[in-house]
């Protein structure tokens, strides 16, 4: 008998944020995350100390999934960001950096947690109300008559992921493929409730990125021998399909627990095989041309199908089942019981395809909204990062269909929001404190901490020691290289703002970001030219960024409100 140990008492810590260890750990986490932010973000190599593969990334989903944090405060932060990313796919780094900045800034102030939380909530409501209003000059409506805005959005996502290691030509090629794949998932017939289809990403490593392509329907990898043996003759009316999610190998894997009782001299193998052959006869009688099985098909049943010119493909895997059901219209069959004819589906044709050294069955649908993105890359690491980026871009396009706006990127939304909040608080402080019941001094310091946190996120885009500026007309971010900074004449040094909307030849004045400047009212009228020049802009997903802003502030408030941390050490 193993030695029994007495249970250790739980460890209770008060005011966790007052601990210097927690503060320093939070600062380190912020540094790691902030250094990944933006197109010139630094890559991180993650690997387990006990071995395993090395993962190179700058994306929040991969970074936080592989980053081990132990303190409960950090777990709250990382879990909140991961939950946001699982729902919206984008703006994870933005959310994490803003949350860390808010916590650090509030901790330096002489404010009670209750007051800080109340003021943070008010300042958040100012931001969200403005971003949702028609007066917002950070928000651009999506024109569905053109693909320019969609391409800008996809291009912005691709260029913000340096671990994909794409050239400009490759970025344009992949961006166009992502948009094409997305458009293929939109049904032609619009009903009251539109249901988007699905795009499957198939790997082809060791090939040029520009060899990537999009195909309607579905690719199922197979050997060259299988293709020669199984491809049927074409039929004018299409091919009838049966889709099985249960094993057709004759095993008892689905029998569950218990005892199987068999009569004397009865062969279980022969009995099961006869049942499988009876199923095969039923499929032949029902004029099924193609049998797809998630698991294994018995060799004798395969031979039976082959002799009757029925194509049988097994081991397709669970990941393709949903897509196969959409492509064929078939309902997955989960037993060997008599089959109802309504469970069958159909495809237009099945043909062979070869890409690189791989061979595929290509299922061509009748009208299904399923397509395959054959994604090529030079190595495994770049392919994994590119796959994750393509999935993010697809999801962001879906979100944009639901809420057809984009936000200006390149840090301009953050600096513009900070300028808007500063001006609002400066001119309406008396009315705000009358409603909220705090002093103007507390409101001003809380607003400064909030705006500084937003500006720090924008400043995290600069990784090479350059100067970060804000113009005092639009409140947009401007970046100047370290070796060309010229405080005397910024207009000769600067080119365009972070999002690309404005150029430095306009009559503008600038101030160094995070320096002291008088609050100003940023122009809240978006120029009409912006609507036509969206293809040249850096933009972010409206839905994802708005959610990220809310999650960051709410998580910071939750952490600031922590009084005790109780850990079970057993």
UniProtKB/Swiss-Prot annotation:
> Which Gene Ontology molecular function entries are recorded, alphabetically?
ATP binding; RNA polymerase II-specific DNA-binding transcription factor binding; unfolded protein binding
Main subcellular location: cytoplasm
**What ranges does the record give for the region Substrate-binding apical domain, renumbered to this chain?**
198-370
The signal peptide, as residue positions, is none
Instruction: State the encoding gene.
Output: Mkks
Describe the task this protein carries out: Probable molecular chaperone that assists the folding of proteins upon ATP hydrolysis. Plays a role in the assembly of BBSome, a complex involved in ciliogenesis regulating transports vesicles to the cilia. May play a role in protein processing in limb, cardiac and reproductive system development. May play a role in cytokinesis.
Q: How does it assemble?
A: Component of a complex composed at least of MKKS, BBS10, BBS12, TCP1, CCT2, CCT3, CCT4, CCT5 and CCT8. Interacts with STUB1. Interacts with BBS2 (via coiled coil domain). Interacts with CCDC28B. Interacts with BBS12. Interacts with SMARCC1, a component of the SWI/SNF complexes; the interaction takes place predominantly in the cytoplasm and may modulate SMARCC1 location. Interacts with DLEC1.
Q: What is this protein called?
A: Molecular chaperone MKKS
């Amino acid at each position: 008998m193993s030695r029994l140990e007495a249970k250790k008492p739980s460890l209770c810590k008060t005011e966790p944020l007052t601990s210097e260890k927690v503060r320093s750990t939070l600062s380190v986490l912020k540094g790691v995350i902030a250094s990944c932010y933006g197109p010139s973000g630094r890559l991180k190599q993650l690997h387990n100390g006990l071995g395993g593969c090395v993962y190179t990334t700058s994306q929040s989903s991969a970074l936080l999934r592989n980053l081990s944090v132990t303190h409960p405060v950090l777990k709250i932060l990382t879990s909140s960001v991961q939950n946001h990313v699982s729902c919206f796919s984008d703006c994870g780094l933005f959310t994490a950096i803003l949350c860390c900045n808010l916590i650090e800034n509030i901790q330096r102030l002489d404010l009670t947690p209750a007051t800080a939380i109340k003021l943070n909530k008010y300042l958040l409501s100012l931001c969200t109300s403005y971003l949702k209003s028609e007066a917002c000059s950070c928000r651009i409506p999506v024109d569905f008559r053109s693909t320019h805005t969609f391409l800008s959005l996809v291009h912005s996502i691709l260029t913000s992921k340096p671990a994909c290691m794409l050239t400009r030509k490759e970025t344009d090629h992949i961006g166009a493929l992502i948009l094409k794949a997305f458009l293929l998932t939109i049904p032609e017939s619009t009903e009251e409730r539109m249901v988007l289809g699905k795009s499957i990403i198939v790997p082809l490593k060791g090939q040029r990125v520009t060899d990537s392509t999009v195909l309607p329907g579905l690719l199922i990898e197979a050997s060259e021998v299988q293709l020669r043996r199984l491809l049927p003759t074409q039929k004018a009316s299409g091919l009838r399909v049966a889709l099985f999610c249960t094993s057709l190998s004759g095993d008892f894997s689905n029998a569950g627990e218990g005892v199987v009782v068999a009569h004397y001299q009865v062969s279980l193998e022969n009995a099961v095989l006869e049942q499988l052959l009876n199923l095969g006869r039923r499929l032949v009688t029902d004029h099924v041309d193609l049998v797809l099985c998630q698991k294994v098909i018995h060799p004798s049943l395969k031979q039976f199908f082959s002799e009757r010119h029925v194509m049988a493909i097994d081991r397709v895997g669970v990941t393709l089942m949903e897509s196969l059901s959409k492509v064929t219209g078939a309902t997955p069959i989960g037993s060997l019981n008599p089959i109802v004819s309504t469970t069958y589906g159909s495809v237009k044709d099945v043909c062979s395809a070869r890409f690189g050294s791989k061979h595929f069955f290509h299922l061509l649908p009748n009208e299904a909204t399923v397509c395959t993105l054959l994604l090529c890359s030079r190595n495994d690491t770049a392919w994994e990062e590119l796959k994750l980026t393509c999935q993010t871009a697809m999801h962001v396009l879906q979100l944009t269909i639901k809420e057809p706006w984009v936000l200006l990127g390149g840090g301009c939304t953050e600096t513009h929001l900070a300028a808007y909040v500063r001006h609002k608080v400066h001119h309406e402080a008396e009315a705000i404190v009358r409603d909220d019941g705090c002093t103007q001094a507390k409101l001003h310091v809380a607003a400064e901490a909030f705006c500084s946190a937003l500006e720090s996120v924008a400043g995290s885009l600069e990784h090479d020691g350059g100067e970060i500026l804000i113009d005092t007309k639009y409140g947009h971010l401007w970046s100047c290289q370290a070796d060309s900074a010229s405080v005397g004449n910024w207009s000769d040094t600067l080119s365009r703002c972070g999002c690309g909307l404005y150029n430095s030849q306009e009559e503008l004045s600038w101030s160094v970001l995070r320096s002291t400047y008088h609050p100003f009212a940023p122009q809240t009228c978006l120029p009409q030219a912006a609507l036509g020049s969206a293809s040249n802009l850096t933009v972010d997903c409206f839905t994802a960024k708005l959610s990220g802003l809310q999650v960051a502030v709410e998580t910071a408030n939750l952490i600031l409100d922590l009084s005790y941390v109780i850990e079970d050490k057993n």
